[in-house]
């Protein structure tokens, strides 16, 4: 059985949006990685501090699936210019190198659907030049079109959204696909 490790930037639709998994949580549901590395910008750190929404949902998913996720938070509290493409490639490359060394027996999954376009672009590029031990995974929206943001992300009730997440069923739709670099 293949072991997986997930590296994911975190974006505004994580962990749950419109009563469906955000990309990061959906990849966890489908691939069941042993370790999950979450990369948070200043704004995402503020949400994390408020209600621990990312770890909360991953741990609840683990309870639902009977799977233990080892979650690591990478906080970048000074990162505000998340739109700048030049910021991410070098740092992501180094982080992923460390992850690969620590988990040499695992396949690394890169979430190329969460975060800003610059974050996703850097991860897609790293996957394209890295070979077979890294898989870029994209996750389609439930509607297969642009996400409508119905909830107020600042007044987010993580317990409510977990309870009413429509993907918490055995017959959920797998929206993951491997990106062909």
Predicted stretch roles:
Residues 1-109, 118-181:
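Long, low-complexity, Lys/Arg-enriched
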């Amino acid at each position: 059985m293949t072991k997986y490790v997930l590296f994911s930037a975190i974006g505004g639709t994580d962990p749950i949006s419109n009563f469906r998994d955000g990309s990061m949580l959906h990849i966890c549901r489908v691939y069941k990685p042993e370790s999950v590395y979450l990369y948070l910008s200043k704004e995402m750190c503020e949400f994390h501090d408020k209600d621990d929404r990312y770890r909360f949902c991953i741990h609840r998913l683990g309870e639902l699936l009977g799977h233990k996720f080892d979650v690591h938070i990478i906080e970048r509290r000074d990162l505000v210019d998340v739109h700048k493409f030049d910021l991410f490639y070098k740092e992501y490359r180094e982080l992923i190198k460390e992850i690969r060394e620590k988990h040499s027996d695992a396949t690394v999954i890169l979430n190329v659907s969460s975060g800003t376009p610059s974050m996703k672009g850097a991860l897609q590029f790293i996957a394209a030049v890295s070979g077979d031990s890294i898989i870029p995974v994209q996750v389609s929206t439930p509607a297969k079109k642009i996400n409508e943001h119905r909830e107020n992300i600042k007044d987010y009730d993580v317990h409510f959204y977990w309870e009413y997440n429509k993907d918490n069923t055995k017959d959920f739709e797998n929206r993951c696909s491997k990106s062909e670099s």
